[in-house]
Regions:
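Structured, non-membrane catalytic/scaffold regions adjacent to prosthetic-group chemistry
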Residues: 1-175
Length: 175
């Protein structure tokens, strides 16, 4: 998803009214995580397949319902993208995309396709439903800008968190 800190509050889901004040980091800064990933560089796989990095796209296809696909320019695919099989020292869990998922650092999470089943190399991006309708930016002139990718780094203080209060003056560990 591209909802950087979209914790499901008002405005994120039309008509949602929050009745309980947020108390945890995921409630106030949801859709954030920190993991150590294990995998293979996509550029290594593409090199071994004989792909020439010029003016083409890769299309990552996942086993999600609706056959989730994302188009990624070859320049990014050959940079720091990984095909991952491990998270935090263990195999990826099913809810995180087992057995394989794409990891696209610095880009919206929707590009890190879970349950990866196929990677295609093409001369044009896929025009799937999500790419055409959900992950576009409407410009002031009424036109749409497709293929929004980058998402800047983010830091969140997790401790103290939510409703926690410091007991008074002194030294505290902030994490």
């Amino acid at each position: 998803c591209g909802g950087n800190s979209a914790a499901g509050g008002p405005g994120f889901i039309p008509g949602l009214v929050r009745t309980i004040p947020p108390a945890t980091v995921q409630q106030t800064h949801g859709l954030t995580s920190c993991s150590e990933w294990t995998g293979v560089s996509l550029s290594l796989l593409l090199d071994q397949a004989g792909v020439k990095p010029k003016g083409i796209w890769i299309i990552a296809e996942g086993e999600e319902r609706g056959m989730h696909t994302k188009s990624i320019p070859i320049e990014k695919a050959m940079d720091d993208v990984l095909v991952v099989y491990g998270q935090n020292g263990e195999p990826i869990r099913p809810e995180q995309g087992y057995p394989l998922r794409l990891l696209v650092p610095g880009w919206e999470g929707i590009n890190s396709v879970k349950w990866l089943r196929r990677i295609k190399v093409t001369h044009q991006p896929a025009m799937g439903m999500k790419e055409m309708t959900r992950y576009t930016r409407l410009l002031s002139n009424g036109k749409s800008h497709w293929f929004e990718f980058e998402m800047g780094p983010k830091s969140v203080i997790t401790r103290p968190s939510g409703g926690q209060q410091l007991s008074g003056p002194g030294f505290y560990e902030i994490t």
